[in-house]
Amino acid sequence: SKFSNFREIVSKMIKTPVFDGHNDLLLALWRSNDLDGNDFIFGREKGHIDLPRCKKGGLKGGFFAIFVPATNVAPEAFWERHPDLVKNKKGAKEKMPSNNLLNTEQISQTYAYAATIEMINIARNIADQNPDKLEICTDYGTLRNCIDKEKIALLLHIEGAEAIGSDLTQLEILYNIGLRSIGPV
Protein backbone atom coordinates (compact mmCIF):
# COMPACT_ATOMS: atom_id res chain seq x y z
CA SER A 1 0.00 0.00 0.00
CA LYS A 2 0.98 3.64 -0.34
CA PHE A 3 1.15 4.01 3.44
CA SER A 4 3.75 1.26 3.91
CA ASN A 5 5.88 2.84 1.17
CA PHE A 6 5.59 6.18 2.97
CA ARG A 7 6.85 4.61 6.22
CA GLU A 8 9.80 3.12 4.37
CA ILE A 9 10.65 6.52 2.87
CA VAL A 10 10.41 8.26 6.25
CA SER A 11 12.56 5.55 7.83
CA LYS A 12 15.26 6.11 5.20
CA MET A 13 15.05 9.88 5.61
CA ILE A 14 15.59 9.62 9.36
CA LYS A 15 18.77 7.61 8.74
CA THR A 16 20.02 10.01 6.06
CA PRO A 17 22.59 12.48 7.36
CA VAL A 18 21.53 16.12 7.01
CA PHE A 19 24.08 18.74 5.96
CA ASP A 20 22.86 22.34 6.01
CA GLY A 21 23.96 24.27 2.92
CA HIS A 22 23.56 27.65 4.62
CA ASN A 23 22.47 28.97 7.99
CA ASP A 24 22.63 32.42 9.56
CA LEU A 25 23.17 31.33 13.15
CA LEU A 26 26.39 33.32 13.68
CA LEU A 27 24.78 36.55 12.49
CA ALA A 28 21.78 35.98 14.77
CA LEU A 29 24.00 35.33 17.79
CA TRP A 30 26.19 38.35 16.97
CA ARG A 31 23.22 40.66 16.56
CA SER A 32 21.81 39.50 19.91
CA ASN A 33 25.26 40.03 21.51
CA ASP A 34 25.48 36.33 22.46
CA LEU A 35 29.25 36.09 21.93
CA ASP A 36 29.50 32.81 23.86
CA GLY A 37 26.79 31.16 21.78
CA ASN A 38 24.75 30.08 24.80
CA ASP A 39 21.45 30.40 22.94
CA PHE A 40 22.76 27.86 20.43
CA ILE A 41 24.26 25.54 23.03
CA PHE A 42 21.29 25.37 25.40
CA GLY A 43 18.46 25.96 22.94
CA ARG A 44 16.59 29.09 22.04
CA GLU A 45 13.01 30.03 21.40
CA LYS A 46 13.74 32.28 18.45
CA GLY A 47 15.51 31.15 15.34
CA HIS A 48 15.77 27.98 13.34
CA ILE A 49 18.85 26.28 14.68
CA ASP A 50 20.30 25.33 18.04
CA LEU A 51 22.27 22.37 19.37
CA PRO A 52 19.34 20.44 20.88
CA ARG A 53 17.36 20.71 17.62
CA CYS A 54 20.45 19.84 15.54
CA LYS A 55 20.85 16.59 17.45
CA LYS A 56 17.14 15.80 17.34
CA GLY A 57 16.93 16.50 13.61
CA GLY A 58 20.00 14.51 12.62
CA LEU A 59 22.08 17.49 11.47
CA LYS A 60 25.62 16.32 10.79
CA GLY A 61 27.00 19.71 9.86
CA GLY A 62 26.66 22.72 7.68
CA PHE A 63 27.98 25.93 6.26
CA PHE A 64 27.76 28.49 9.05
CA ALA A 65 27.53 31.73 7.13
CA ILE A 66 29.04 35.01 8.22
CA PHE A 67 27.20 37.99 6.77
CA VAL A 68 28.19 41.50 7.76
CA PRO A 69 25.06 43.65 7.72
CA ALA A 70 24.76 47.36 7.16
CA THR A 71 26.20 49.38 10.01
CA ASN A 72 22.75 50.63 10.99
CA VAL A 73 21.72 47.11 12.11
CA ALA A 74 24.94 46.17 13.92
CA PRO A 75 24.38 45.66 17.65
CA GLU A 76 25.13 48.68 19.83
CA ALA A 77 27.49 46.52 21.91
CA PHE A 78 29.68 46.07 18.80
CA TRP A 79 30.30 49.82 18.66
CA GLU A 80 31.09 49.83 22.38
CA ARG A 81 33.71 47.10 21.81
CA HIS A 82 35.13 49.00 18.80
CA PRO A 83 35.03 52.73 19.55
CA ASP A 84 37.69 53.28 16.87
CA LEU A 85 35.15 52.18 14.23
CA VAL A 86 32.27 54.43 15.32
CA LYS A 87 33.14 56.85 12.51
CA ASN A 88 32.01 54.08 10.10
CA LYS A 89 28.56 53.89 11.70
CA LYS A 90 25.70 55.39 9.71
CA GLY A 91 22.30 56.50 10.95
CA ALA A 92 19.57 53.89 11.06
CA LYS A 93 17.15 56.08 9.11
CA GLU A 94 19.59 56.98 6.35
CA LYS A 95 18.17 56.78 2.82
CA MET A 96 19.93 54.02 0.95
CA PRO A 97 20.74 54.37 -2.75
CA SER A 98 18.01 52.88 -4.94
CA ASN A 99 20.55 51.13 -7.19
CA ASN A 100 21.89 49.06 -4.28
CA LEU A 101 20.56 45.52 -4.77
CA LEU A 102 20.66 44.58 -1.09
CA ASN A 103 19.41 47.98 0.08
CA THR A 104 22.43 48.46 2.34
CA GLU A 105 25.19 51.02 2.24
CA GLN A 106 28.68 50.12 1.16
CA ILE A 107 30.45 49.05 4.31
CA SER A 108 34.07 49.71 5.20
CA GLN A 109 36.60 46.91 5.12
CA THR A 110 37.65 47.62 8.72
CA TYR A 111 34.05 47.32 9.99
CA ALA A 112 33.46 44.16 7.93
CA TYR A 113 36.69 42.57 9.13
CA ALA A 114 35.99 43.34 12.81
CA ALA A 115 32.44 41.96 12.56
CA THR A 116 33.67 38.86 10.68
CA ILE A 117 36.30 38.15 13.33
CA GLU A 118 33.65 38.47 16.06
CA MET A 119 31.35 35.99 14.31
CA ILE A 120 34.19 33.52 13.78
CA ASN A 121 35.02 33.87 17.47
CA ILE A 122 31.42 33.00 18.33
CA ALA A 123 31.81 29.77 16.34
CA ARG A 124 35.13 29.07 18.05
CA ASN A 125 33.60 29.71 21.49
CA ILE A 126 30.78 27.28 20.74
CA ALA A 127 33.23 24.63 19.52
CA ASP A 128 35.63 25.16 22.44
CA GLN A 129 32.80 24.80 24.98
CA ASN A 130 31.49 21.62 23.34
CA PRO A 131 34.43 19.68 21.86
CA ASP A 132 32.53 16.40 22.18
CA LYS A 133 29.49 17.74 20.27
CA LEU A 134 30.81 19.89 17.42
CA GLU A 135 33.94 21.08 15.69
CA ILE A 136 35.05 23.67 13.16
CA CYS A 137 36.19 21.70 10.12
CA THR A 138 39.10 22.88 8.03
CA ASP A 139 39.68 19.78 5.93
CA TYR A 140 37.99 16.61 4.72
CA GLY A 141 39.55 14.45 7.45
CA THR A 142 38.06 16.59 10.21
CA LEU A 143 34.69 16.62 8.46
CA ARG A 144 34.71 12.83 8.07
CA ASN A 145 35.78 12.41 11.70
CA CYS A 146 32.89 14.61 12.88
CA ILE A 147 30.37 12.54 10.96
CA ASP A 148 31.86 9.27 12.23
CA LYS A 149 31.89 10.48 15.86
CA GLU A 150 28.39 12.00 15.74
CA LYS A 151 29.76 15.52 16.12
CA ILE A 152 28.30 18.47 14.23
CA ALA A 153 30.68 19.76 11.58
CA LEU A 154 30.91 23.55 11.30
CA LEU A 155 32.25 24.89 8.02
CA LEU A 156 32.83 28.63 8.17
CA HIS A 157 31.63 30.60 5.15
CA ILE A 158 31.62 34.34 4.48
CA GLU A 159 29.02 36.01 2.30
CA GLY A 160 30.85 38.57 0.22
CA ALA A 161 34.47 39.65 0.51
CA GLU A 162 34.06 43.02 2.21
CA ALA A 163 36.24 41.87 5.12
CA ILE A 164 39.19 41.15 2.83
CA GLY A 165 41.51 43.99 1.86
CA SER A 166 43.06 44.36 -1.58
CA ASP A 167 46.40 42.90 -0.42
CA LEU A 168 44.60 39.71 0.76
CA THR A 169 46.30 39.75 4.18
CA GLN A 170 42.94 39.34 5.89
CA LEU A 171 42.15 36.32 3.70
CA GLU A 172 45.21 34.52 5.03
CA ILE A 173 44.31 35.42 8.62
CA LEU A 174 40.70 34.29 8.15
CA TYR A 175 41.92 31.04 6.57
CA ASN A 176 44.27 30.45 9.50
CA ILE A 177 41.41 30.79 12.00
CA GLY A 178 39.08 28.42 10.16
CA LEU A 179 37.44 30.06 7.14
CA ARG A 180 37.07 27.65 4.24
CA SER A 181 34.36 29.09 2.01
CA ILE A 182 33.61 32.45 0.37
CA GLY A 183 30.65 33.21 -1.84
CA PRO A 184 28.18 35.89 -2.84
CA VAL A 185 25.57 34.38 -0.46
Residue ranges and their predicted role:
Residues 1-185:
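N-terminal hydrophobic targeting/anchoring segments and the immediately downstream early-domain regions
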